[in-house]
């Protein structure tokens, strides 16, 4: 099964309620920061098929689109024609799901269901890890989560987890995918950066795109950092 690099990056954090006066973090990428404490990131759990997290990638969703196209492709009735599944725009998938003919919409719906089961399985395995077992909420970002198709896939995975009596809450980050990582960078930057500057040039390298922008620092306790 051809998986691509994960487009969904899940980082578990714990919000700090107090910060020692005059605390200065001197290491970029430090775990202990004024607003948050980074507990776990980049889980490299593997099995015989490779990295488990790759099954929750945008590439995995495209794989399921292709799988659901095969029955119609075999009889020459693929509604997507010769278009590669990996190159179908998210907006086109959203439009087909909402207003497309029944078979085209059914392909998208089938891929959503298949991907949701895969995502729920990945999250269950992650939540068994020591660093994840106490997670109260998992927040999804990235371009896939910003589409209606992505929202439904994540929402369906959340329902599947609830059916397994898993209490960890599943949310989608409220900021636009192009802005979310840049906003978060200000909370992960070392404090010395803001001793003489009001903002930083943040860079977000995702699974598909690279984004850069000016990010101002604000206390995590004064903003709605989650939905």
Tell where the protein language model's regions lie, with residue ranges.
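ATP-binding/phosphotransfer module of carbohydrate and carboxylate kinases, centering on a glycine-rich
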Residues: 2-227
């Amino acid at each position: 099964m051809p998986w691509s690099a994960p487009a969904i990056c899940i980082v578990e954090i714990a919000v700090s309620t107090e910060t020692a006066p005059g605390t200065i973090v001197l290491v970029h990428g430090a775990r202990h920061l004024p607003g948050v404490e980074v507990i776990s990131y980049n889980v490299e759990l593997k099995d015989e098929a490779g990295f488990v997290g790759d099954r929750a990638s945008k590439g995995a969703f495209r794989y399921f689109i292709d799988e659901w196209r095969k029955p119609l492709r075999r009889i020459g009735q693929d509604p997507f024609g010769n278009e590669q599944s990996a190159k179908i725009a998210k907006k086109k998938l959203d439009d087909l799901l909402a207003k497309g003919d029944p078979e085209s919409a059914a392909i998208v719906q089938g891929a959503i269901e298949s991907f949701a089961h895969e995502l729920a399985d990945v999250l269950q395995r992650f939540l068994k890890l020591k660093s994840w077992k106490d997670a109260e909420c998992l927040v999804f970002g990235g371009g896939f989560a910003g589409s209606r198709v992505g929202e439904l896939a994540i929402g369906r995975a959340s329902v599947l987890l609830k059916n397994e009596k898993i209490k960890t809450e599943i949310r989608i980050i409220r900021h636009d995918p192009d802005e979310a990582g840049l906003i978060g960078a200000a909370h992960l930057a070392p404090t010395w950066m803001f001793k003489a500057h009001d903002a930083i040039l943040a860079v977000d390298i995702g699974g598909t795109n690279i984004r850069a922008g000016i990010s101002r620092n604000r206390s995590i306790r004064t903003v709605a950092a989650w939905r």
